[in-house]
Amino acid sequence: MAEALSERYRNRIHRALSRPNLLMGADRELVLITGLAAVILIFVVLTVYSALFGVVVWIVIVGLLRMMAKSDPLMRQVYVRHISYKPYYKATTSPWRRY
């Protein structure tokens, strides 16, 4: 019995496999989507003002997304799951309360 316990295998779990997928400190997909929207705004309007506005809006949104990821890196996935389950789990004070 003692021999079986001493011969345990150790498997390393790499940190990259358990970390959330972030880009610039925010959710990767949301940063890329907002960057795409800013680039589309810049190249569709093609003025200096639209370029400045697009860059400023993107920087502000990335800042907000970083604050969101700092509080909970998986907040987007949790919110999407919350929206999908909303019809099934009504917001009540008790699960046994009648509607």
From Swiss-Prot:
Membrane topology summary: Multi-pass membrane protein
GO cellular component: plasma membrane
Keyword Transmembrane: yes
Principal subcellular localisation of the protein: membrane
Keyword set, alphabetical order: Cell membrane, Conjugation, Membrane, Plasmid, Transmembrane, Transmembrane helix
UniProt subcellular location: Cell membrane
Origin: domain of life: Bacteria
InterPro entries membership: Conjugal_tfr_TrbD, T4SS_VirB3/TrbD/AvhB
Record-annotated membrane-spanning stretches: 21-41, 42-62
Family under the similarity heading: Belongs to the TrbD family.
Protein's recorded name: Probable conjugal transfer protein TrbD
Source organism (scientific name): Sinorhizobium fredii (strain NBRC 101917 / NGR234)
Gene: trbD
